[in-house]
Structures are given as C-alpha cells and as structure tokens.
UniProtKB/Swiss-Prot annotation:
Coiled coil: none annotated. It comes from Clostridium botulinum (strain Kyoto / Type A2). The keyword S-adenosyl-L-methionine applies. Belongs to the methyltransferase superfamily. RsmH family. Pfam families: Methyltransf_5. The gene is rsmH. This is Ribosomal RNA small subunit methyltransferase H. It is found in: Cytoplasm. S-adenosyl-L-methionine binds at residues 33-35, 53, 79, 100, 107. The keyword Transmembrane does not apply. Keywords: Cytoplasm, Methyltransferase, rRNA processing, S-adenosyl-L-methionine, Transferase.
C-alpha cells in the first residue's frame, strides 16, 4: 500500500518554526515527509534536515518524496532518543524541531497494522514493528486492574472497568486475536444509548495504542531533551491530536517557562531554576474550518509552539 498522510496544520507549523535558510532542523515524526518538504524548500544548500521515524514504511516513503534534496539525514529511531541521535550525528544544537503526534493515514488505513477499529485485522498497533510489545500482548496478558487503569487514564473511557472485565472474561475462553473481536467485546460492554456518541471502540483503541507505544512517557522526556538541544531563539512546534497529549505539552511548556519552585512568599528566587523557553502560543493553534472540512482527521489537532531563550 502507498504511504499516504495528509500533513495537518502544514502552513501554520512551517511559519511557527521561523526558518533560517542555513539552519539545522529536526522532524521528529517524518511520516510521509510533508512537513519536511516544506522545511527543505526554505533551506539553502547550507541548511540541514534530520528526519526521524520509527516506522520503516514512513522512511521509505519520505525518501521517495524528498529524493530531490541532498541535505536530509534519515534516522530510523524513536524521537524519545533525540539526544543520542544528535550526539551520534555530532550535532550539538539545532534551530527548530517539529513533532506531529498523529497516527498517519497510512497506518490507520493499512489493516494489517491493527490501529483501526473499522477494519478486522490482527491486534498489533506497533509504530515500530521491531518492538516486542503489541496490542495482542496488552489485551491478552495484562491483569484486569492494569487494563482498567490504561483504559481510564489513556482513553478517558467511562466504561473502562466493565470493558476490562469483559476482555478478561472473553480471553479465558480463547485468546483475543483480532481488532474485530475486540470491537465486539467493547460493543457488548457499553450500553447501547452511549454507542451513539461516535464509535464505541475509539477510546479503548486509543488507550491501547498509547500503552503499546509508550507515547505519553516518550513525549515528556522528548520535550525536555528537545529544548536542551535548541539554539537560542530556536523553536519547538508540537501538533497533538487528543487531550492527554495536549495537556502534557501545555504543562511541560509552563514548567519550562516558569520553573521556579520557591514559595510565593519569597521576595526573590533562591531555587536557581531559570526559565528555558518563552511560550509563543498562549492558546493552541487549531486548523481552519476549511482544513477540517477537507481532512476530517485534523479536527482534534492543536499546535503549541515555544522559543528557546
């Protein structure tokens, strides 16, 4: 299948980076290369782009899309490791970093990846297919209490307790092997009147995907490491697609902008923690009405940007 991914908030994200033609930029989520191509258009031959992705299909697609550009370095890795990636490339500081945290259209549409609740496929959901933990492992081996917490915390699923119980009951008969089987279990666990609010499996699938790929843990560390790697006035632009991610970015940015831990009663700061960034987007940038109509998957997208000081 051809790797397809429509870049969300493309123009807004590129503008937010304030690109210098001889700068060094990192696309932490290369995908099909949509954002990267627009960055490269603004770079001279002295500029450089590092494209990171843990999905080999994405890297292959990006190489084809960006074949006319020679100033690209492709890295098959997780942006969790951005610090060591730049270390290995002997790059100290960069001028801008972008993270697009959405699952690509390709990953959702390719049934065998197991991300979609709309298609029956083996339970997988691994962004990096070289990793061991898959959705199958989570669904069939996690304790009921552990499943409940994942569905509640990562999916904000109001019926998380019941869904977890139904999963455990069903797997005692036979292992749950496909997305279709899991969807049926979820449908039975959620009362009919609540199934009118979008697809009943949406939140559960989100929660399991986040657990499989350790998305929230990765994000927290990656933000800190990215800021440390920015030159003065360098920008970090992050696109999120659900409230959990957006909350992490919002809170982490605030921590880095105002890190002082001194009690309010102290006349001066004595903790020694200095601000590292200035938040550019006091409120997140959202897609235009037109973009939401053209690309329904952009509807929940939010862009937050900060500048290194």
């Amino acid at each position: 299948m051809e790797f397809k991914h429509i870049s969300v908030l493309l123009e807004e994200t590129i503008d937010s980076l304030n690109i210098k033609e001889d700068g060094v930029y990192v696309d932490c989520t290369l995908g099909g290369g949509g954002h990267s191509k627009e960055i490269l258009k603004k770079l001279s031959h002295k500029g450089k782009l590092i494209g990171i992705d843990q999905d080999t299909s994405a890297i292959k697609a990006a190489k084809e899309r960006l074949k006319d550009y020679e100033n690209v370095i492709y890295v098959h890795n997780n942006f969790y490791n951005i610090d060591s990636i730049l270390e290995e490339l002997d790059i100290d500081k960069v001028d801008g970093i972008i993270m697009d945290l959405g699952v690509s259209s390709y990953q959702l549409d390719e049934a065998s990846r197991g991300f979609s609740y709309m298609k029956d496929a083996p339970l997988d959901m691994r962004m990096n297919r070289e990793e061991n933990l898959s959705a199958y492992n989570v669904v069939n081996s996690y304790e009921e209490e552990e499943l409940f917490k994942i569905l509640k915390n990562y999916g904000e699923e109001k019926f998380s307790r019941k869904i977890a119980r139904f999963i455990v009951e069903k797997r005692t008969e036979n292992p749950i092997e496909t997305t279709g089987e899991l969807v049926e279990i979820i449908r039975k666990a959620i009362p009919a009147k609540f199934q009118r609010e979008g697809h009943p499996a949406k939140r559960t699938f989100q929660a399991i995907r986040i657990e499989v790929n350790k998305e929230l843990q990765i994000l927290n560390k990656a933000i800190e490491d990215s800021v440390n790697r920015l030159n003065k006035d360098g920008r970090l632009s992050i696109i999120t697609f659900h409230s959990l991610e957006d909350r992490i970015v919002k809170v982490k940015f605030k921590e880095l902008e105002k890190p002082c831990t001194c009690p309010p009663s102290f006349p001066i700061c004595v903790c020694g923690k200095e601000p590292q960034i200035k938040i550019i987007t006091k409120k997140p940038i959202e897609p235009s009405k037109e973009e939401k109509e053209i690309n329904s998957r952009s509807r929940s997208a939010k862009l937050r940007v900060c500048r290194k000081i």
